[in-house]
């Protein structure tokens, strides 16, 4: 292990004594594969003298890991603060194929390559999805504790200082270009002690600390609606595990969630069974039981090896940026409705934000300001806002009742729907449609919704 003592720079200081060093793993040889950033030579902000720009990334999930790596590669003195190095988040763990390539992820951190999905309606009608996938295409299934640790390690290899600590609060700058003072509790993983209070001064902060973000609270970023996700990891027999070898299941219905879905996703040697809800959080365990019952025959005899719960944001925060502080990932609210996807968008937003800082600071040589970080938000909104709006509409239309969910599952049987859905999901690009097929899809959608509404009216009559 290599012991690295943080240096004291003019205008910035760390309150801990010089001999209170931070221990990091030795960096491995690193192959630089990231694309070059275009640096504007007309920057008018002051140069940073005698040191490089200092940035703290709070939170070590996909957003924080991707941000810290990009910053460190770009010449920024980077500090990544993560409170729990083995954190297991209740996350389905699905990642799109494009993320594997964009973030150079090794295949050995992917537990399963899902090529088949079953969408199961409230009446247990199952539709097989994945017929249009090409031989090389798949949805990757990962464990968050594995993915997150890998991205943090890569950030450390790029030069970031990874600190095991709990972020407490942040003192705002007292003058233009003055530092932010971060207060955190530093932990020693060897002693498992109560921790030591420390401070760190930095020029900018990236808040990647999740749905309960303390960085967001520090800049009064505002609240948002959130879902509660509940997940159990269940160890099942080898013969039952073969069924889920490359298959994931999604269950819809009022029994598993009034506004989301239940899932069974395969991991390395177990399955993750979970559900979520925004409107009925107190009933989450009831919905989880219903999800298990729906999948009962396929997971019977399984042993629960871990139980996890966590909030999931439902829309972006009212404020995602203030001065030299920006929010990314769940802290910013970047989780899609309808699907609940967040891993890719977290990592992508972390990278985008870091790129804006690297570019604005001219590889760490100049101070950044809010206009530099705002470029990240402008690029993000232009690229992904339409995706969020479309999925928001889909959730409102198809998740509002059991008849609507039946119509949704019926639509999923259409190969054109599957192709458009998978192409958009796997590559995060709006797939070009066929005008004739689009017209057929519109007619079929209307027909499905008409049948769903007729069914709902009949069910309402029977309930009177």
Swiss-Prot record:
PANTHER family associated with the record: GERANYLGERANYL DIPHOSPHATE REDUCTASE, GERANYLGERANYL DIPHOSPHATE REDUCTASE, CHLOROPLASTIC
GO MF, any single term: FAD binding
Keywords on record: Chlorophyll biosynthesis, Chloroplast, NADP, Oxidoreductase, Photosynthesis, Plastid, Transit peptide
Enzyme class: oxidoreductase
NCBIfam families linked: BchP-ChlP (TIGR02023), ChlP (TIGR02028), GG-red-SF (TIGR02032)
Transit peptide: 1-54
Homology family: Belongs to the geranylgeranyl reductase family. ChlP subfamily.
One annotated GO biological process: geranylgeranyl diphosphate metabolic process
Pathway given in the UniProt record: Porphyrin-containing compound metabolism; chlorophyll biosynthesis; Cofactor biosynthesis; tocopherol biosynthesis
Gene: CHLP
Name used for this protein in its record: Geranylgeranyl diphosphate reductase, chloroplastic
Reaction(s) catalysed by this chain's protein: phytyl diphosphate + 3 NADP(+) = geranylgeranyl diphosphate + 3 NADPH + 3 H(+)
Compartments where located: Plastid, Chloroplast
Function: Catalyzes the reduction of geranylgeranyl diphosphate to phytyl diphosphate, providing phytol for both tocopherol and chlorophyll synthesis.
Pfam families: FAD_binding_3 (PF01494)
């Amino acid at each position: 292990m290599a012991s690295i003592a943080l240096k004291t720079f003019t205008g910035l200081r760390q309150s801990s004594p010089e001999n209170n060093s931070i221990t990091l793993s030795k960096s491995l040889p690193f192959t630089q594969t990231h694309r070059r950033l275009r640096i504007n030579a007309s920057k008018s902000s002051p140069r940073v003298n005698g040191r490089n720009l200092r940035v703290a990334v709070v939170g070590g999930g996909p957003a924080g890991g991707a941000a810290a790596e990009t910053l460190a590669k770009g010449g920024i003195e980077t500090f990544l603060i993560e409170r729990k190095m083995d954190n297991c988040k209740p996350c389905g763990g699905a990642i799109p194929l494009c993320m594997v390539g964009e973030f150079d992820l090794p295949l050995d951190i992917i537990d399963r390559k899902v090529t088949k999905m079953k969408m199961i309606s409230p009446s247990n009608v199952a539709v097989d999805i994945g017929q249009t996938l090409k031989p090389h295409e798949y949805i990757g299934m990962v464990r968050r504790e594995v993915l997150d640790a890998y991205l943090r390690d890569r950030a450390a290899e790029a030069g970031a200082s990874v600190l095991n600590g709990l972020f407490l609060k942040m003192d705002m700058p007292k003058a233009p270009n003055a530092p932010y003072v971060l207060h955190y509790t530093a932990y020693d993983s060897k002693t498992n002690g109560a921790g030591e209070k420390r401070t760190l001064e930095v020029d900018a902060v990236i808040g990647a600390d999740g749905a309960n973000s303390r960085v967001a609270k520090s800049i009064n970023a505002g609240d948002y609606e959130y879902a509660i996700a509940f997940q159990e990891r269940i160890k099942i027999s080898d013969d039952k595990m073969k069924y889920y070898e490359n298959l994931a299941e999604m269950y819809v219905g009022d029994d598993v969630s009034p506004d989301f879905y239940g899932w069974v996703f395969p991991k390395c040697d177990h399955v993750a069974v979970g559900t979520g809800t925004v409107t009925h959080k107190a009933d989450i365990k009831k919905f989880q039981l219903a999800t298990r019952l729906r999948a009962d025959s396929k997971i019977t005899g399984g042993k629960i090896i871990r139980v996890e719960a966590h909030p999931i944001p439902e829309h972006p925060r009212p404020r995602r940026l203030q001065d030299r502080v920006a929010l990314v990932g769940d802290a910013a609210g970047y989780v899609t409705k309808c699907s609940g996807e967040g891993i890719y968008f977290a990592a992508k937003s972390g990278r985008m934000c870091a790129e804006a800082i690297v570019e604005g600071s001219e590889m760490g040589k100049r101070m950044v300001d809010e206009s530099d970080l705002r470029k990240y938000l402008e690029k993000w909104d232009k690229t992904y806002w339409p995706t969020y709006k479309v999925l928001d509409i889909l959730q409102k239309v198809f998740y509002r009742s059991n008849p609507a969910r039946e119509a949704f599952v019926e639509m999923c049987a259409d190969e054109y729907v599957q192709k458009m859905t998978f192409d958009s999901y796997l590559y995060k690009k709006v797939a070009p449609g066929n005008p004739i097929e689009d017209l057929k899809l519109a007619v079929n959608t209307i027909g499905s919704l008409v049948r769903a509404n007729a069914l709902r009216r009949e069910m309402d009559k029977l309930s009177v």
